[in-house]
Swiss-Prot record:
It is a multi-pass membrane protein. This is Photosystem I assembly protein Ycf4. One of its GO terms (biological process) is photosynthesis. Keywords: Membrane, Photosynthesis, Thylakoid, Transmembrane, Transmembrane helix. GO terms for cellular component: photosystem I; plasma membrane-derived thylakoid membrane. The keyword Transmembrane helix applies. The lineage of its organism: Bacteria, Bacillati, Cyanobacteriota, Cyanophyceae, Synechococcales. Its main location: membrane. It is found in: Cellular thylakoid membrane. Seems to be required for the assembly of the photosystem I complex. The chain crosses the membrane at residues 19-39, 61-81. The keyword Thylakoid applies. The gene is ycf4. Pfam families: Ycf4.
């Protein structure tokens, strides 16, 4: 049974880099809020600088708007991290003759089923430079290429080649792009 089924988990947005960005935006938003309140109240609420000396109407008000924008952005980032958008699995079932690609969306799960007989090849893309792309995808008859790797940090080249070769061997199709 194990030889008939291959399941690959896919990492979503619950990564350390995303958590650090959300944390920095949250802390920055709180800092802008305290600076705005210090300007309004005329008292220093922050240990650094002297925000009480700022005139409220132009500077303090703008800092309050920055804190509102940071709160909205941080709320979105924490929601995406909590829901773990983009996580899921790639399930290859030879006995049923179907490939199921499932991901967790923002509002609802996303699932795509592809018959194995429609898969023409496993494609490995490597593009270095400013916009680096390293991904494994399925070349499907009558459709666009279906990406299988996670979005974000590129995989090491050795792991990318190994994953592509293992998948092509399992599905019995060609490996393209190397």
């Amino acid at each position: 049974m194990a030889a008939e089924l291959l399941e690959q988990p896919v990492l979503g947005s619950r990564r350390l880099s995303n958590i650090l960005v959300a944390l920095m935006v949250t802390i920055g938003g709180i800092g802008f809020l305290f600076a705005s309140l210090s300007s309004y109240l005329g008292r220093d609420l922050l240990p650094l600088g002297h925000p009480a000396g700022l005139v409220f109407v132009p500077q303090g008000l703008i800092m309050g708007l920055y804190s509102l924008a940071a709160a909205l952005l941080a709320s979105y980032l924490w929601a995406v991290i909590t829901i773990n958008v983009g996580s899921g699995s790639n399930r290859f079932d030879r006995s049923a003759g179907v490939v199921t690609i499932s991901r967790r969306g923002f509002r609802q799960p996303i699932s795509v089923e592809i018959p194995i007989k429609d898969i023409q090849a496993v494609k490995v893309e490597v593009r270095d430079g400013f916009n680096t792309r390293r991904r494994v995808s399925l070349r499907v008859r009558g459709r666009r290429d279906m990406p299988l790797t996670r979005v974000g940090e590129p995989l090491p080249l050795a792991q990318l080649e190994q994953d592509g070769a293992e998948l092509a061997r399992f599905l019995g199709v060609n490996l393209e792009g190397l």
